[in-house]
Amino acid sequence: MSELLSFALFLASVLIYAWKAGRNTWWFAATLTVLGLFVVLNITLFASDYFTGDGINDAVLYTLTNSLTGAGVSKYILPGIGIVLGLTAVFGALGWILRRRRHHPHHFGYSLLALLLALGSVDASPAFRQITELVKSQSRDGDPDFAAYYKEPSKTIPDPKLNLVYIYGESLERTYFDNEAFPDLTPELGALKNEGLDFSHTQQLPGTDYTIAGMVASQCGIPLFAPFEGNASASVSSFFPQNICLGDILKNSGYQNYFVQGANLRFAGKDVFLKSHGFDHLYGSEELKSVVADPHYRNDWGFYDDTVLDEAWKKFEELSRSSQRFSLFTLTVDTHHPDGFISRTCNRKKYDFDGKPNQSFSAVSCSQENIAAFINKIKASPWFKDTVIVVSSDHLAMNNTAWKYLNKQDRNNLFFVIRGDKPQQETLAVKRNTMDNGATVLDILGGDNYLGLGRSSLSGQSMSEIFLNIKEKTLAWKPDIIRLWKFPKEMKEFTIDQQKNMIAFSGSHFRLPLLLRVSDKRVEPLPESEYSAPLRFQLADFAPRDNFVWVDRCYKMAQLWAPELALSTDWCVSQGQLGGQQIVQHVDKTTWQGKTAFKDTVIDMARYKGNVDTLKIVDNDIRYKADSFIFNVAGAPEEVKQFSGISRPESWGRWSNAQLGDEVKIEYKHPLPKKFDLVITAKAYGNNASRPIPVRVGNEEQTLVLGNEVTTTTLHFDNPTDADTLVIVPPEPVSTNEGNILGHSPRKLGIGMVEIKVVEREG
């Protein structure tokens, strides 16, 4: 209803101003600004909805505020371009409509009415309400009743008798199991759900609506709210260090805790969270690649579900035979938005809906088949009688190709339990939320029936039942939950450990690289991760007087304040204010001690603008002074005009990437020498090894042959035509995810370049 009212007010404002208000520059600018704000708010809501399926929420702040890196970014380029073009067109059209009667005399009353209607349209819009609520949640002091509802359970289970298998289905919400809405979509796993304890009303709350947040909520009984931008969780050394979570209780009770997934464990800090709370055995893409049958069988995120669940079954067998009490947690990935992935072993590879194939539904149908097969193996084993199997979604599906159909239904998270010791078949319709999952499992295993804000759905009362406004209540508790981190509020001295790539201050430890915004009462860490922009782009968003400490590779800050370090890949520390003074210090010891040194200086806005502009230069446009092209740092030598077909810098150099161009092209600003030696230090990838690799300058072509290890080769060129471009053509680029950023489409690698040098020959 508010959407219709908001749009009606917007339309009325446009029509009244366009046809009645007349000419006045101030009123035109004010009305256009407010109407433009309405447009921007609603496009923001649309864009956020595209990713989260739930509008502008904490997931937007957590994972999508800085960049889309790692999110299968290529799938979002067209929608992003469409939004920008649409916004430009709407603003242009809006300005043209409002100025239609600019030659008529100004009418104060109609101008005021149009402006008030425009303000009303903004106030009534759902986007404005959602943003307002998020802002309020950032600034609240907390709720005095938090301590009454947050309860720490006993640290042990008195007499544990059951092993635990806990399966997180990526985005596998219960809505998919509605056979009337989606016929025969989940027959195998749906049948198993109906055989167990099925909790049909598991609500999603703020701070529980993405994978790591859903895991924290289900294991610790609290939403994931943090005293820093959410992706910093990948950089911290401990995760809610003072809290007692399910993994801690299991470990204290004699369980060996295992976690298996197909993606990289570092993504979003899952490794940090699990290690902080009782898990000593973790398996992700890096750990599995040496043990799986086919290490090259991967999707954009890691190993397919059939591979992961096969490894989980092997681990279940091994642990069951050992007679050691254990828990085995696993997380699938094939149903990840926006499209999902289809494992090759599935019988159900295609699902048609609305008269056409739907990739997300197909991925769901395939993944549930794999999960059901895993569960049926356990049920058929002699160890099932000692096992509790839990299946839950980590969160509701985000905006995938099935989302518009899901959104027509009453949406709930999946949570059901199959007990080998005591079979129970029942659908329980109690109101509950993800935070109740851990408490319910703990209750079944013989422990307490509460865990944080979670309560057992078998013997307790959920916060969702106690509070009708549970979403608002959860946000009111946000400051109280943030305080559970015990995060430092000041930074005076710090230590950098080069061996561990860590920085420590005030009792907290973070992985490098790291950017910190330091104020009198708050220290905010901003990491560089799969879902965040490079640190220099984040620093460019700082205000002129914001104090910062930036720890990164020297070459990344050298172009601004230390050109002598432009080719150094060592660690450096920069601190200061973008509009004031900055210093750069080279970390020259294994354990390096530093102090913050912020000075109150006069802010120079010209200096600030220059720093921001330099920070925002994209990698390929950076230039440095050197007599060769060094590939393990960003940019190129000053002599290079442009280059293409080359991937991002890595610690050793850069790969050619046929996704960016079939050839490696390096165009110089001036013609190459008449006679020169081309000294190439490089290696080949896969089938490109021991193959002739054409290297061209103008009309002359030489052949380069490389192995899988780095070697240096010198080629001799004559350049009578004054050509200015070097071209290298890898013969057989290989599509692979090796060394790739999580969630990105595979690269097509050919040769790995360490250094290329042009040496002029006499004569």
From Swiss-Prot:
* Record flagged with keyword Transmembrane: yes
List the Gene Ontology MF annotations in alphabetical order: phosphatidylglycerol-membrane-oligosaccharide glycerophosphotransferase activity
Q: How does it sit in the membrane?
A: Multi-pass membrane protein
Q: What is its EC number?
A: 2.7.8.20
Which pathway? Glycan metabolism; osmoregulated periplasmic glucan (OPG) biosynthesis
Q: Does Phosphoprotein count among this protein's keywords?
A: no
Q: What CDD domains has UniProt attached to this entry?
A: LTA_synthase (cd16015)
Q: What does this protein do?
A: Transfers a phosphoglycerol residue from phosphatidylglycerol to the membrane-bound nascent glucan backbones.
For this chain, the family text in UniProt reads:
Belongs to the OpgB family.
Q: What NCBIfam families does its record include?
A: PRK03776.1
Q: Specify the protein name.
A: Phosphoglycerol transferase I
The species this protein belongs to is Escherichia coli (strain 55989 / EAEC)
This protein's gene is called: mdoB
